[in-house]
Each structure stands twice: as C-alpha cells, then as structure tokens.
Amino acid sequence: LGVLLERELEDELTHSIEELPVECRTVFKKSRFEQKKYEEIALELGISINTVKYHIKNALSLLQKRLDNYLHLLIIYIFMDI
C-alpha cells in the first residue's frame, strides 16, 4: 500500500506542478528542483525578487489546495504503519 500511495502522490504532484501557470511553474522549478536562489532566478528571468517570491507563494498555495486530499491519505497511512 505504501509504494502505491507514494507513486500516486508523486504522479499527482508532478501533474499539479505541470498545471501551474507557466511563469509560476518556471520559477517554482528553478527554486525547488534546481536549488537556485531567488536572486539568481530574478536575474535569469529578468524579473524582480518580489515577483519571484510572489510566484513561489502562489505555486505553494495552488499545490497545497490541489494536494489537500492526499494529505488525509498520508495521515491515515502513517497511522496504519505504526
């Protein structure tokens, strides 16, 4: 069950990231997957650091809403595994 849930969550996260607005997704990926600093992202994309912060905040909010149902499944799984 754990592997199935993990795989499903990973697929849903990937799908959810791909559904983010383009610039939001680009900033999020550079921050989280490429481990770039906000200053680097801003310089690379020609946007302000505040715009980078806005996109990260927006991405996290959208992902949280999208993945909220999976949080409940993870909690149940954790308690089943104890």
Which residues fall in each region the model found?
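Acidic, proline/glycine-rich intrinsically disordered inter-domain spacer in sigma factors
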Residues: 1-15
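Short amphipathic alpha-helical boundary/capping segments
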Residues: 11-21, 62-65
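Helix-turn-helix DNA-binding module
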Residues: 18, 22, 26, 34-51
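Glycine/proline-rich, flexible active-site/cofactor-binding loop segments
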Residues: 26-28, 47, 69-73
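DNA-recognition helix of helix-turn-helix
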Residues: 44-68
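C-terminal edge and immediately downstream basic/flexible tail or linker adjoining helix-turn-helix-like DNA-binding
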Residues: 60-82
